[in-house]
C-alpha cells in the first residue's frame, strides 16, 4: 500500500452461511479524497465498513486502513479514525455539554473549537439532554463528537438516513467544510444520490455483494450515456448490445442507457433503421440509478482509484 492510499482491500470476502455478503472486493481509497460508497439495501456496504474497522472478520481476503492490517488494528490507528453510523447511539441522560466533556477525556487531540462549531451549526443548546433531541439534532451531536478528535480518516455509514431535508443539508455542509483539509479522507455510504454530486470525488458501486464500478465521479458521469431512438412505427427487437444498462420501449421509440457508448454500438443501432438517434448525458443520479438496474453487467468501468500515484 502506498502512502497515498488510505484504504485498500484485496479479494475481501465475507460469507454468512453459504451466501456472500461481500465478494472479492478490491478497493483503493486515495488520501485526501471524499469517497462515496453506494448500493441498494443488502448490497454489503455496512458489512464492508465493519470489516474495514476490524469489527467483523473477513472470511477471506485482506485489507489495510491507514497502513494497518484490518484484522489487527492497534489503538493508535483507531485514534486516527472517526466512525459515525445511522443509529447515533448516545447516553440519553447526558446533555450535549456532558457528551463533549466525557468524550474529550479519551482523545489527546480533542478540539473544543471543532466540537462547538458543529454543535452551533446544528443549533444545539449545550444544556439540552440527548433524550429530548430530535433525530437531526442527535445526528449533529454525533457528528460533533466524531469530528472533535480531528480524525485523519472519517468513515460515515449512512448517517443522514431518516433525517429531514434541513438536517441532511446541515450534515452535508459539515462534510463540505471538512474537505478543506487536503490530508483528511472521507469514506461514506449513502442512500441519497444527491449527496454524491455535492461532495464526492470518487464513487464505488456495490451491488449483489460485488463491486460494479469504482472511479472518479466525473469519469463515471462521462461513461454513461442515454440514447433515444425514434422509428416510423413500432420499434424492432434489440440485438445483443455491449454495455446496455437499461432499455425502455415506447409506441414508436426506445430509450437506452449505455456505459461506454461508442461508434461500434452506434453502427449496431443503425442496423435497426431508426429515423433518429439522439445521444445525451445523464445526471449523476440518473446514471447511478441506471447502473444499479437489474439488466446491468458487472465491472464496466475500470477503477482509476485502484492504483493511485
Question: For each predicted feature, which ranges?
Answer:
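A broad structural signal for short, well-ordered beta-strand segments within beta-sheet-rich domains
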Residues: 24, 224, 244-245, 274-278
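A structural detector for beta-sheet-dominated domains
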Residues: 10, 30, 230-232, 259, ...
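Short loop/turn segments at beta->alpha junctions
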Residues: 95, 216, 280-283
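ABC transporter nucleotide-binding domain
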Residues: 171-264
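Alpha-helix C-terminal capping segments
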Residues: 104, 119, 236-241, 266-273
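A structure-centric signal for secondary-structure junctions around beta-strands
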Residues: 3-4, 78, 224, 253
Amino acid at each position: 500500500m502506498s502512502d497515498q492510499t488510505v484504504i485498500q482491500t484485496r479479494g475481501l470476502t465475507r460469507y454468512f452461511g453459504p451466501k456472500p455478503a461481500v465478494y472479492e472486493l478490491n478497493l483503493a481509497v486515495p488520501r485526501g479524497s471524499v469517497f462515496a460508497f453506494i448500493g441498494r439495501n443488502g448490497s454489503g456496504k455496512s458489512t464492508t465498513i465493519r470489516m474495514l474497522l476490524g469489527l467483523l472478520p473477513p472470511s477471506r481476503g485482506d485489507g489495510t486502513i491507514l497502513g494497518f492490517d484490518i484484522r489487527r488494528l492497534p489503538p493508535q490507528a483507531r485514534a486516527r479514525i472517526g466512525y459515525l453510523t445511522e443509529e447515533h447511539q448516545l447516553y440519553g441522560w447526558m446533555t450535549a455539554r456532558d457528551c463533549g466533556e466525557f468524550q474529550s477525556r479519551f482523545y489527546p487531540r480533542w478540539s473544543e473549537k471543532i466540537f462547538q462549531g458543529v454543535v452551533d451549526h446544528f443549533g444545539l443548546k449545550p444544556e439540552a439532554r440527548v433524550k429530548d433531541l430530535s433525530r437531526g439534532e442527535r445526528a449533529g451531536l454525533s457528528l460533533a463528537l466524531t469530528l472533535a478528535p480531528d480524525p485523519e480518516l472519517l468513515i460515515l455509514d449512512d448517517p443522514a438516513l431518516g433525517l429531514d431535508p434541513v438536517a441532511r443539508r446541515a450534515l452535508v455542509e459539515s462534510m463540505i467544510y471538512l474537505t478543506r483539509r487536503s490530508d483528511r479522507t472521507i469514506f461514506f455510504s449513502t442512500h441519497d444520490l444527491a449527496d454524491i454530486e455535492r461532495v464526492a470525488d470518487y464513487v464505488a458501486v456495490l451491488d449483489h455483494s460485488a463491486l460494479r464500478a469504482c472511479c472518479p465521479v466525473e469519469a463515471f458521469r462521462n461513461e454513461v450515456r442515454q440514447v433515444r431512438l425514434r422509428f416510423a412505427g413500432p420499434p424492432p427487437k434489440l440485438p445483443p448490445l455491449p454495455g446496455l444498462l437499461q432499455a425502455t420501449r415506447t409506441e414508436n421509440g426506445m430509450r437506452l442507457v449505455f456505459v461506454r457508448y461508442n461508434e461500434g454500438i452506434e453502427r449496431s443501432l443503425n442496423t435497426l433503421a431508426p429515423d433518429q438517434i439522439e445521444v445525451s448525458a445523464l445526471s449523476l443520479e440518473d446514471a447511478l440509478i441506471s447502473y444499479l438496474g437489474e439488466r446491468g453487467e458487472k465491472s464496466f468501468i475500470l477503477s482509476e482509484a485502484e492504483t493511485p500515484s
